[in-house]
Amino acid sequence: SVYEHTANALRHLKKNGCAPDLTQVGNEITFGMLWPTAKTDPFNEKNWDVLADLLKSGVRACREVCPNARLIIHTEHAGDWDATKNYYMRLRNHNVDYDIIGLSYYPMWHKDIPNLSRTLDSLAVDFPKKDIMIVETAFYYSHDNDKWAKSKDEHSDLYAISEDGQAQFTKELVDMLKKHPKVTGLYWWFPEENESGKKVIGSWINRGLFNNHTGKVVKAMKNFADYRSNND
């Protein structure tokens, strides 16, 4: 069950001295989880009672095993305000307990930074008791036509696909997030990707904070660290 799986995983972490400060039930679950059983849609009530029950089971395990950890519910449509709002409204209507709204934000899929800023403004108004975190973000510093990246042209109109372009994106994102007091965390997706990354996922994604070709830290690392220096 979701409860047993979650509780066992957390007990294992605690036993080994790694009790988390944050927990998250599900990953990018705008459209539910454990398909088809709990497949959902933010615009349709179908299966939401099932999803809510599964989330409540996971939440109960988190609260019991790690009572001091704050709990995130993580979705991946930050570029679509209606979908984001509907999702968290349905959580509210089904009385799902959590602390933090977690969002994935990738500019190549979720529109530009001003659009994300508007979503954050609206979340702060409609869900004032919830903190917000960007729990996944990244952008390219290189493009090797890998299986995840689609085409280079698809993303090059946002920022240059280069270390400078990645650094510009990171700086603009951090500068914007600092203006939103409800945002309390920023996490880079797969920052540790390096020259051995192909062994992990089968290809290079080239969105980490180490250059796959040189093994050196990319320029965006400094911009990313600027967020933490203002939010300790």
Feature names for model-found ranges:
Residues 29-33, 79, 107-109, 141, ...:
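Feature marks short, surface-exposed loop/turn motifs that line or immediately flank catalytic pockets
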Residues 19-21, 27, 73-75, 84-114, ...:
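Aromatic- and acid-rich polysaccharide-binding/catalytic face
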Residues 4-8, 40-100, 118-130:
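Active-site neighborhood of glycoside hydrolase catalytic domains
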Residues 6-45, 72-74, 183-190:
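Active-site groove signature of glycoside hydrolases
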Residues 1-7, 45-56, 81, 110-117, ...:
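Non-membrane alpha-helical structural segments and their capping/turn regions in soluble enzymes
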Residues 1-25, 50-61, 87-94, 167-180:
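An active-site-proximal structural segment forming one wall of the substrate-binding cleft
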